[in-house]
From Swiss-Prot:
Known catalytic reactions: S-sulfanyl-L-cysteinyl-[protein] + uridine(34) in tRNA + AH2 + ATP = 2-thiouridine(34) in tRNA + L-cysteinyl-[protein] + A + AMP + diphosphate + H(+)
Keyword Transferase included in the entry's annotation: yes
GO molecular function: ATP binding; tRNA binding; tRNA-uridine 2-sulfurtransferase activity
Entry protein name: tRNA-specific 2-thiouridylase MnmA
Gene Ontology cellular component terms for the protein in this record: cytoplasm
Source organism of the structure: Corynebacterium urealyticum (strain ATCC 43042 / DSM 7109)
Keyword Transcription assigned: no
Length: 406
């Protein structure tokens, strides 16, 4: 097959390209130029879109002896990822920009251009397994990236290859070193590539502006003021601006954010727990399960947040979501209701809920949706009139009182 290897400049995409070549495919390397201001993109080895990354990708392509190109998707990236990121926070949602980039850039813009140019597939370094249209978790549980691929359609997956998904990361680094790739020991990227200094709150503030509001406790008492709800995330403990210690001595966390009124609510850790999720913007879920319950596991964060659940698909014919967003053409006309069999903490509106079926050969990804509401423990799963929450953090971050999104 003729394939396009998406080369980020990291070790995973380098080995993916090498494996595609070794498998006998005709391979070209493509690096995506995503920033309209290259000098504003993170410099150094921890970014994923820097000029150094482009140079690293080119050196790997030269080592492999394959053609190398840089394709400029900066306009698409700004409109579909950066602007979406800002707009989502402005309406009280918490988007995952890496997931959005996969959906709109790597497996829409890149894939569409590749197919138009006569290529058969796109090769990436994602840690996921794909065989005969079945998408599974990667073998390396610590590096599994199937979650951020949950938004892909069956049609897109038919033109995807994930060559490193059956290997653990240390072996990938060894393989890269044996091949003489200079990126063999390059650190993984973790931060948001379009926020070079990692100051998400300042970035959002520069785009959204001051929107003062109140911080209230669960009893409705005003305990502080703030400059904008985008400075908070559900589960956040530090930096709340609370002027005094709580009477009971227990720490307080952000439990809810209402972007419409500008109100941030704080409460105890117990107040973070949810027992149900409602999701829309559904992808890949089998129409045959419509109207009946099925057991699954649901993951709500890229790393962690996996619990067993009982799910069902119900009709949701409205063309507009509760947040006012018009549904896209490839979204299924239903909503997903999930009864969590174990509670989750810090679940956010706007995050992805990715559904799996456990399997000994690697959990099978069934589909995904975007969280639009949650229900409290013991409450029925139904549309909630109260506004949704913003932000989501890993359990470890809650325990340490750190904000995992900032």
């Amino acid at each position: 097959m003729r394939v396009v290897a998406a080369m980020s400049g990291g070790v995973d995409s380098a080995v993916a390209a090498a494996r595609a070549l070794e498998a006998g495919h005709e391979v070209i390397g493509v690096h995506l130029a995503l920033s309209q201001s290259p000098e504003a993109v993170r410099a150094g080895s921890r970014g994923c879109c820097s000029l150094e990354d482009s140079a690293d990708a080119r050196r790997v392509a030269d080592k492999l002896g394959i053609p190398f190109y840089v394709w400029d998707f900066s306009d698409r990236f700004k409109a579909d990822v950066i602007d979406n990121f800002v707009d989502s926070y402005a309406i009280g949602e918490t988007p995952n920009p890496c997931l959005r980039c996969n959906e709109k850039i790597k497996f829409e813009a890149l894939l569409d251009r590749s197919i138009a140019l006569g290529f058969d597939a796109v090769v990436t370094g994602h840690y996921a397994q794909l065989h005969d249209g079945v998408l599974r978790r990667g073998v390396d549980a610590d590096k599994d990236q199937s979650y951020v691929l949950g938004v892909l359609t069956d049609e897109q997956l038919a033109h995807c290859m994930f060559p490193v998904g059956d290997t653990v990361k240390p072996e990938i680094r060894e393989e890269a070193a044996d091949a003489g790739f200079g990126v063999a020991n390059k650190p993984d990227s973790h931060d948001i590539c379009f926020i070079p200094d990692g100051r998400t709150q300042a970035f959002l503030g520069s785009k959204i502006g001051l929107r003062p509001g109140l911080v209230r406790d669960t009893g409705g008492e005003t305990v502080a003021e703030h400059d904008g709800v985008y400075g908070f995330t559900v589960g956040q403990r530090k930096g709340l601006g609370l002027p005094r210690e709580t009477l009971d001595g227990r720490p307080r966390y952000v439990t809810d954010i209402d972007a419409h009124t500008g109100t941030v609510t704080v409460g105890t850790r117990e107040d973070l727990r949810v027992g149900g999720i409602i999701a829309d913007r559904l992808k890949r879920l089998d129409p045959e399960v419509h109207g009946r319950e099925f057991d699954c596991e649901v993951q709500v964060r890229a790393h962690g947040g996996v619990v067993p659940a009982r799910a069902r698909l119900v009709d949701d014919p409205t063309p507009v979501t509760p947040a006012g967003r018009v549904k896209e053409a490839d979204e299924l006309p239903w909503r997903l209701e999930l009864e969590l069999l174990q509670p989750l903490e810090g679940v956010a509106r706007g995050q992805a809920a990715v559904v799996y079926r456990p399997d000994e050969d690697g959990d099978i990804l069934l589909g995904s949706g975007t969280i639009r509401a949650t229900t409290a423990l013991g409450a029925p799963i139904e549309e909630q009139p109260a506004p949704g929450t913003v932000g989501a953090v890993d359990a470890d971050a809650i325990e340490q009182g750190e904000d995992a999104q900032r």
